[in-house]
């Protein structure tokens, strides 16, 4: 029993002692895709992030959603296309997080193109959005993982869930 406990403890110490900077790293690229949560339909998104420094990344992202609502007794459908950029700081190095995890936070800015019927009486104008996000990724393979991001203050989404591929 003592041997089993020792092996388990050594394994845990080794697992948490092995850490690195952001899995993306400087000059790395990662592709992200998934679905989001929003008050204006369910967005589908795809994005590309670039490692610009050891712990910093810049990215671009596009999203699409179709949103239907009943307003003054009639049904209206809107389409929203978003184009945004983001900047993130990755906390792996300073928090000594294992390299199969990626914890980050940052800011985003984007423009959201609303397409609504001409007779739509509600609000739904194209707009500029500015927001913040905090997120994490878990890489179950060296280059492939899952991502979860929570955000606010913009027209894009309140949260996102998807996949990440580093190349």
Where are these regions (language model features)?
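Short glycine/proline- and aromatic-enriched beta-strand/turn motifs that initiate or cap beta-hairpins
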Residues: 19-58, 64, 87, 160, ...
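Short loop/turn motifs that connect adjacent beta-strands in outer-membrane beta-barrel proteins
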Residues: 21-28, 54-55, 92-102, 140-143
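Transmembrane beta-strands of outer-membrane beta-barrel proteins
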Residues: 29-33, 58-60, 83, 101-107, ...
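Solvent-exposed loop/turn segments connecting transmembrane beta-strands
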Residues: 32-45, 71-75, 124-127, 148-162
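Transmembrane beta-strands of outer-membrane beta-barrel pores
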Residues: 35-41, 62-68, 91, 109-115, ...
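Transmembrane beta-barrel domains of outer membrane proteins
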Residues: 47-49, 88-92, 135-137, 151, ...
């Amino acid at each position: 029993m003592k041997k089993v406990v020792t092996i388990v403890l050594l394994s845990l110490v080794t697992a948490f002692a092995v850490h690195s900077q952001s899995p993306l790293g400087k000059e790395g690229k990662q592709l992200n895709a998934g679905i989001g949560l929003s008050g204006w339909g369910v967005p589908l998104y795809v994005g590309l992030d670039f490692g610009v420094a050891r712990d910093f990344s810049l990215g671009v992202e596009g999203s699409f959603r179709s949103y239907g609502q009943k307003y003054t007794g009639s049904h209206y459908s809107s389409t929203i296309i978003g184009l945004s950029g983001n900047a993130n700081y990755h906390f792996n190095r300073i928090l000594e997080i294992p390299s199969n995890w990626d914890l980050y936070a940052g800011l985003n800015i984007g423009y959201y193109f609303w397409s609504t019927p001409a007779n739509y009486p509600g609000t739904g104008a194209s707009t500029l959005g500015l927001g913040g996000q905090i997120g994490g990724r878990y890489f179950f393979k060296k280059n492939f993982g899952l991502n979860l991001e929570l955000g606010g203050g913009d027209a894009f989404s309140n949260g996102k869930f998807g996949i990440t591929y580093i190349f």
